[in-house]
Amino acid sequence: DVHLEQVNDAYPDNEFDYEIINYMEKMVELDDMIGLIMDELDANGELDETLFVIYPDHFPYMLDRDLYEEYIGIEIEDKELKRQTLIMYAEGMTPEVVSTPGSTVDIAPTILNMIDSSGEFTYYIGQDLFGSTENFVLFSDLSLTDGRSFLSMDETVFGEPFDMLAFEVVLERKIAALEIQKKILNSDYFKE
């Protein structure tokens, strides 16, 4: 309960469950840590040359789902649990919200395009999230989304109507890329 006082100061009349308070304390700890890093970079004259990239790889699964839904005030569909926010920050950066589907494979091309706008990143499986090309995300269960529609492997469809053939072509391409990733991760480059 190191940060309980800060949570109580922010929410003086809170009647949150202990799990929610514990989660909030972890967020305070993260915020404090980022602040310390920024202060140190600023003191060393390096803050202007730093890009912060923050990406949670999951929703707060350590929380009871019903409790989490009560806290955020909405009921979440299973597919929505996979939606996460990528935060990128640099000094002087103009704030912008970009709502496009993406996954971890899209982070490197996005960062590289911010640093080098040539857009020549053919060796990456992902794509620049700030680009104009429509992006699709393949999940570990091989379901696919373009942010508007969601196709599961049993061909259950959620969201807006779409061209099934086009989705199947993208699905095949994404699965092929996934196979390449597996080969890369499972190979011993230095042995061969």
Where do the language-model regions lie?
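Solvent-exposed soluble domains appended to multi-pass membrane proteins
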Residues: 1-192
